[in-house]
Amino acid sequence: SSGAPKRTSEGKDGFGATTGMGICHSYTPDGRCVSLLKILLTNFCVYDCQYCVNRRTSNVPRARFSVDEVVKLTTDFYFRNYIDGLFLSSGIIQSADYTMEQLVAIARELREVHNFRGYIHLKTIPDADPALIAAAGRYADRLSVNIELPTEAAVERLAPEKKVHTIKLAMGSIRRKLDEKAEEPRSPKFAPAGQSTQMIGGADASDDQTILSTAETLYGSYKPKRV
């Protein structure tokens, strides 16, 4: 990737910004930079994680896209060469299964109805039915499950409605599916770009050593492409 600083036209007249609201840049294993429409299906959420701006008790404006709206945004931007793909996440609405069903429906419609061949990254909801996670992998290039924080104690304190055990079960399920695909190349497609995860630094007192140790454990246990 280029060592040049990222340009922004925020607050200025002009064009050519390399950063901007809604479009992020990611790098493929071969070094290519790809532009992704990075959006939430909704910022409504039933969870009240203390570190999240969209937590249940946060006084922020709320919005929600429909499945058709996300599909249209993605295809319109793609055909105009604004993006190379979609990075889709969501707050939790109604239930984990309901929300995951909506994410899968978007990916399914893009692939099967619109023959979309761009990149799709879906955030996976750990509490969702494993069958929904498996379905997500059939349509997405990459899946990701957030580990949230560097330690289980921090998750229990700052996001008590989430369970590290459940998060790790979801990551383990994805790893097994990826291993099965590697052993049987002719089996149905499953997240060919693998899985990734992320955690928030600075929300608790974890030092660099703790963060690096957690990342090392995750790489060893679940083989994510990126932490």
Regions found by a protein language model. Name each.
Residues 54-60, 86-96, 120, 155:
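Short acidic, glycine/Ser/Thr-rich loop/turn "cap" segments at secondary-structure junctions
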